[in-house]
C-alpha cells in the first residue's frame, strides 16, 4: 500500500509539512557540520558520521513529503515535473556561475569560489542526467503547442495550462506560489 498522500487533507497535514521541512533543513545542517568538522578540525570520521545523519534526515523529509502528496504520483505529472526539473538544473549552472563571480568580488577565497564553480558543473550534470532519464524512460510527448510557464525563483518549467491548477498550487521545486510563474 502506498504512503503517497495519506495525510493530505487531514488534521496531520500541517504537522507532516513542518516535519518534512524540518528534516530537509536538518539534512543541510548535518552536511554543513560535516564540512566544518573536516575542513576546520580535520575530523574526517566525524564528517562521515554527519554525512550519514544528513542522508537519513533527507530521507525522512522525503517520506513526510510523500505522506502529504507533495510531489506528483500521476505518471504524466511525474514526467512533467522531471522535465521541468531538468530544465531548471540546466539554468542552475549559469545562476551558480554568476553567484561564484559575485562571491569572488566579495572576497571569498579561491578555494571557496572553486567549490561554488564545481556546484555549477554539478547542476549542469544534474540537467544532463535527468535529460538522459527522460530520453530513456519517459513517454514521448509533443509540447510544442502547449503553454510554458517558468518559476521566477528557481527556473522550474511548467508545461500545460497553469490556470487549471488549484489556487494553492506551489512550485514543486522551491514551493513558491502559482503567482511566481511567468508565461513564456
Task: Describe these PLM feature segments.
Residues 1-184:
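Non-heme di-metal
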Amino acid at each position: 500500500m502506498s504512503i503517497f498522500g495519506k495525510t493530505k487533507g487531514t488534521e496531520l497535514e500541517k504537522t507532516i509539512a513542518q516535519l518534512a521541512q524540518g528534516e530537509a533543513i536538518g539534512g543541510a545542517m548535518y552536511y554543513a557540520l560535516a564540512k566544518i568538522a573536516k575542513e576546520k578540525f580535520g575530523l574526517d570520521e566525524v564528517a562521515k558520521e554527519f554525512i550519514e545523519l544528513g542522508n537519513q534526515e533527507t530521507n525522512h523529509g522525503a517520506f513526510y513529503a510523500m505522506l502529504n502528496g507533495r510531489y506528483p504520483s500521476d505518471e504524466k505529472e511525474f514526467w512533467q515535473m522531471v522535465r521541468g526539473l531538468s530544465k531548471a538544473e540546466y539554468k542552475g549552472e549559469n545562476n551558480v556561475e554568476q553567484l561564484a563571480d559575485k562571491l569572488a568580488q566579495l572576497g571569498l577565497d579561491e578555494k571557496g569560489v572553486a567549490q561554488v564553480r564545481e556546484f555549477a558543473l554539478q547542476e549542469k550534470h544534474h540537467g544532463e542526467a535527468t535529460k538522459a532519464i527522460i530520453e530513456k524512460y519517459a513517454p514521448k510527448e509533443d509540447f510544442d503547442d502547449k503553454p510554458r510557464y517558468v518559476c521566477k525563483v528557481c527556473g522550474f518549467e511548467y508545461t500545460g495550462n497553469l490556470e487549471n491548477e488549484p489556487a494553492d498550487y506551489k512550485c514543486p521545486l522551491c514551493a513558491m506560489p502559482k503567482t511566481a510563474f511567468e508565461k513564456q
